[in-house]
Amino acid sequence: DSSCIIFFMSIVYLVPGNMTGGPYGLKELKRREKLLKDWSFNPSKVKVYDVPNGGSSIESSYEEIASIIPAVDRLSEITKYENIDAAILGCFGDPGLDVFREMFDFPIIGPAQTSMHTACQLGHKFSVITIFDSMLNMAEKQVHEYGLDHHLASVRAINIPVLELLKDLDVTYKKMSKLADKIVNEDRADAILLG
């Protein structure tokens, strides 16, 4: 006789900016929600939210810091009507991850921290592709804060703004592919993170 325990989890994915007010709108929010639902274990509940009074994208240290308080306030608001077991911060910069963990009593996952640690399990070195050269130092600092300097092969920039990545997919894929070749062949990375 074997028994199975099924855990129900309620997971919130919070985009720390105003995605619905941007060029990709509600359609992108729903696309992410569908992906997360497809990837999650049944009978988990996954809901994607954004921050209506947040910026349209996070492409600098200033925008990252400016996103934290509105995002924390938004998650606080959501907890008033949702029973949350865990949350995912929907930005590779993990803006305010420590603040979120301080403010809430459920696990908060940062995609950069999580993917960097996962990359270390998949290979010896990883690289990060970020959006602008101006963000190279931010990404390197983040790797350092997570204690993974010795696993970092490189940080390179695609130099396409977040809100334009999906505008011309051929251009984005060609630039991404060219960077990936350099990362593998010149930097000797085993894994590549898109951030």
Where are these regions (language model features)?
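Short beta-strand segments enriched in small/hydrophobic residues
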Residues: 9-29, 126-129
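Glycine-rich, highly charged phosphate/nucleotide-binding loops
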Residues: 60-77, 171-179
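Active-site rim beta-loop-alpha module in soluble metabolic enzymes
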Residues: 142-195
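A short, Lys/Arg-enriched amphipathic alpha-helix followed by its capping loop at the start of a domain
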Residues: 31-44
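Periplasmic-binding protein-like
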Residues: 14, 84-91, 188-195
